[in-house]
């Protein structure tokens, strides 16, 4: 299930910062916790029970040193989960507390509407609405650190497959019957976003997915890759 949240900027010449994932995440979490603490625990789970998009600004101007100047009357935030209770709680919480603040910019929720979930097959073409994060760990000196992977990295596909199977098992309570899938990257753009006090690298891309329909559906509803609850890995079906 997925929803679109329309946000109305509350000042003239609004400029949206480039980095806002953690602000959106923390405000949604706080709003949901005020009415459904049990659901809020799912939202903060590392297994990724949900995902959300970048803030979609359909008419904009990029200001390299400042952010994104919003030239449209409103912007959109898409939120998705296979758990309808999560989406219901988010919609109710956001309607009850309709203010968002991102950097110096305040928004008011103008509308919330359900988006029709499309039927998927064994082969689909997806486009990302927020970057896909795939990570591994490496030793540097005597320290273990996270290493973000891009699609051209040798470990990317193997790590993505393992992450999706693990997340599916944790969220759905069972392992997928078909675990095999491949992706063919058709377009790719690397990203680096500040989330809290750390940078996270990810991949905006269009990709052809083939294989497990269970994992395709799970990724479509809950996001592909890691850190989906922090606003990564959301996709839309384009073919």
From Swiss-Prot:
Binding partners and assembly: Monomer; homodimer when crystallized in the presence of crRNA. Varying the crRNA sequence varies degree of oligomerization and structure.
Domain of life: Archaea
Source species: Pyrococcus horikoshii (strain ATCC 700860 / DSM 12428 / JCM 9974 / NBRC 100139 / OT-3)
Name by which UniProt lists this protein: Putative CRISPR-associated endoribonuclease-like protein Cas6nc
Gene Ontology BP, a term: defense response to virus
Gene3D superfamilies: 3.30.70.1890, 3.30.70.1900
Keywords: Antiviral defense, RNA-binding
UniProt family annotation: Belongs to the CRISPR-associated protein Cas6/Cse3/CasE family.
GO MF entries: hydrolase activity, acting on ester bonds; RNA binding
Function in brief: CRISPR (clustered regularly interspaced short palindromic repeat), is an adaptive immune system that provides protection against mobile genetic elements (viruses, transposable elements and conjugative plasmids). CRISPR clusters contain sequences complementary to antecedent mobile elements and target invading nucleic acids. CRISPR clusters are transcribed and processed into CRISPR RNA (crRNA), also called psiRNA (prokaryotic silencing) in this organism (Potential).
